[in-house]
Amino acid sequence: MQRYELIRLIGRGGMGEVYLAHDKACSRRVALKKIREDLSDNPLLRKRFLREAKIAADLIHPGIVPVYSICSDGESVYYTMPYIEGFSLKHLLKSVWQKEILSKELEEKTSVKAFLPIFDKICATVEYIHSKGVLHRDLKPDNILLGLFGEVVIVDWGAAIFKHAKELQQEKDEEGFSSYGQKNICYSSMTVPGKIVGTPDYMAPESLLGAEASEKTDIYALGLILYQMLTLSFPYRRKKGRKLPYEDSILSPIEMAPYREIPPSLSQIAMKAIAVDPVQRFSSVQELRKALQPHLQGESEWTTRDILSTKDRKNWKYYEPILLSRYFPVLASSPAQWYNFMLSDMEVNSSVRVECSVTKSSVQEGVGIFFPPSKEADKGEFYCGYGLWFSSQNNELSVSLIKNGIEIQKESQGIIPQQSRFAISIEKSNNKITVFVDQILFILHIDYLPSLGERIEIIIQDLQGISNITILESIGALRVSCLAVPDAFLAEKLYDQAARFYRKIRDSFPGRKESYEAQFRLGVTLLTQIEEQGGDLMQALSTFDLLHGSTGAPLEYLGKALVYQRNGSFVEEIRSLLLALKRYPQHPEIPRLKDHLCFRLYDSLHKHRSEALVFMLLILWIAPEKIGLREEERFLEFLHHRQQSTLFCRIDKTPLQFKSSKMELFLSFWTGFTLFLPELFQRARDLRDYQALIDIFYVVCASGNKEVFSQFAEDLAIFVDEVVFPKSLHNQRGEELVLFVQGLAALQNREYRQAKEFISAVPFALQLYALDLFSLQAFIDEEVKVFSDFLQDIYNSASAEDHKHVLVYMIQVSLWNQDLKQAYELLSKNFPQDKGLIEYSEAFVLWGCYLALTGDRSAVKAHFSRCQFKYGRSALIGKCIDDDSLDYLEGLVWWEKKKTLFQSYFLLRCLHAPKERYEVYRQAYISMENSFFG
């Protein structure tokens, strides 16, 4: 085990112990599980321990921790896995057991609604292992790990085995498995080596009586877990070792915990899963999951209303060829394209799901599915309302969201070249449009204006390329809402009539959902009316104020966020959403806010890309489960050039994973959104994650938040006195981290002599962090001589290999000192222009500054005009040559804006611009607040 350094014990089980360890070869933290020393001489248990590792290694699923390595040489028997930050389900349940009063936070975390998605993920993992022929045989809260980023993983595969394997009989023979009579069943909470496999408390009755394990024994354990989630208690209460006769009845979850508001059907699901007779249980985990679906996240139950055949004219009011460019010019690639056009005779309500499949060839030509309002469609205005256009080119599928004939959103993803058909699902409900292709989310759009009855419209060239179309309606939507009348007025833009009816409903149903929903829609009505007819949008805020403290309180902040969004007050919009999420994290309306966050993310990617980073951070922190693997890949690609421009990403070579603490820190750095830094600091400190702590202090310093920096520094000093940091490949330890932080504090206080003493005592990588932070401060404060000496000391003590990392700062000093010769030599030798410079790189900007120093203003303008990305940071820096308005900087994210101001100031100094010109940029840089909110 020389490769691994054990940091601390995480947990202990029946056979093994799990440690947090440092992998020296890969410079990463891992979880290392080794067989207990008191059991290491038992050949049967060694065999079972290795079988556990091999089974886990063969299973690939998000709910199963992958195995990195397995070692069985000599006395050492262990295997390693990724370390997942989090806690066990048992830990969460134990925190509320036998407590009469719970804190609000704990009550929300352990609510039925909060537990159901967790249970579904557990079931999904068990369904997967059953499909691979594996039985876990020891499912219990102890073996369920809840990660900080929404992960739900099953651990401890010591009892796992393949169904019908020979080992089942061998275990009985070798372990002396004896058949227990009904009256002799005892219960404990731990796997008993040498007797029975599994934890008796969670074993099905037939297993305790000696029957072989099966899928239904795992289902029984799942049922017990669900029972505990619903009731926060175990179904039977017996002292350890006490017999439990089967004649004792088990109370249903509703009877056990009547205060928990458990739906009767959910209670029945739990009781069916723990039925004594295996025949009465669910036949499979898939069946169990299917029964749960209507309860998950308030998901609507759908019923098939009709199936429309594209070949049967009776289903369609209009069924004729059209010239695509006549109605949808934005979609037509050729003015002479003719398509089959079909408009349904039936009318669908506002909650509808449309399902069909289309061939690859038809998508290459383009397929449209639209929802025109019946009133407009009957007048031949087929382009009105919402619609989707599906097209593909070069193995890329694109989905465009069309509103009133205008494309408002477009998303594209790669497809498998051999794929011949695509399954499409479009759902319109609760003011939300979601579009899935082959179960992958393409479009999420929210419109708070209600829609009236609509028809289904299909546009396709070849009718053979589309299947029959299934129309499903929400069961809840089949009931006519009292809000339907004012919704109809609002859809017709009859704002005064709509407002009058919304007020009536609000006053008629005090304390009920209809009341607060009517008040929210009243606010949307007034906001829309002001936006269309002119006026102060902020007047609508008072309408949403009336929701304060009501049963629909989160909608107050959602409504205000809508006002601020339309008013262009982005910071206030974010503040409103955060208040709702902080005050009401488990409120039934919070999923609505999470959906809104997702919509704003996708919408900002399409319209305001700088805002997207903030929404990305919020979703990563609050609702990471909303982001799928395909979206993760897309977002990582979107962030790639910023990653290349971030110092701590270049120094720390650990890959930037989307759902990680490092990504949260990365987004905090770029957005200036430091609200989550205290939690990130505490997490890194508890994990003794040296590199993460360095990065956090760098980000805090870059933000300029001295108060947070001081608090973190005090906490770190106390912590380092109490613990020992693990060695890394660079022998970096806690003492060096303290020196580094003291050096940064000295730089902040302009105590340069002390700063030099502290920073000179730390490794070069840490010196580079300090150098980068000092460079911004030194040039803005015009203390370049001190910085130059600091830089020279670091350069002299660094290795030849490390010299390349400080070249940018040396060039900056040369340019500031107007040393054209040295600046040119450094630039041409290390960043030759003929090799092609990346336009968002520091070197590209420094070449522009060099040209400015030569006095050739036209050459400088030509240099920056070469930028392909006209709204990229480098292109915007060039605008300062002729424009001092700073308005063009508003589209930049916080750190981009700050860096652009600095580099524009530096460029103007090189251009020998009048002081009053470059002082505008200097003061703008200084005046930037030290955080997102200011």
Curated annotation (Swiss-Prot):
Keywords: ATP-binding, Kinase, Nucleotide-binding, Phosphoprotein, Serine/threonine-protein kinase, Transferase. Signal peptide: none annotated. Its EC number is 2.7.11.1. ATP binds at I10, G11, R12, G13, G14, M15, G16, E17, V18, K33. It comes from the Bacteria. InterPro entries: Kinase-like_dom_sf (IPR011009), Prot_kinase_dom (IPR000719), Protein_kinase_ATP_BS (IPR017441), Ser/Thr_kinase_AS (IPR008271), Ser/Thr_kinase_PknD (IPR023507), TPR-like_helical_dom_sf (IPR011990). Pfam families: Pkinase. The active site is at D138. It catalyses: L-seryl-[protein] + ATP = O-phospho-L-seryl-[protein] + ADP + H(+); L-threonyl-[protein] + ATP = O-phospho-L-threonyl-[protein] + ADP + H(+). The keyword Nucleotide-binding applies. HAMAP family: PknD_kinase (MF_01957). Together with the serine/threonine kinase Pkn1, may play a role in the specific interactions with host proteins during intracellular growth. Belongs to the protein kinase superfamily. Ser/Thr protein kinase family. NCBIfam families: PRK13184.1 (NF009651). This is Serine/threonine-protein kinase PknD. It comes from Chlamydia muridarum (strain MoPn / Nigg). The lineage of its organism: Bacteria, Pseudomonadati, Chlamydiota, Chlamydiia, Chlamydiales.
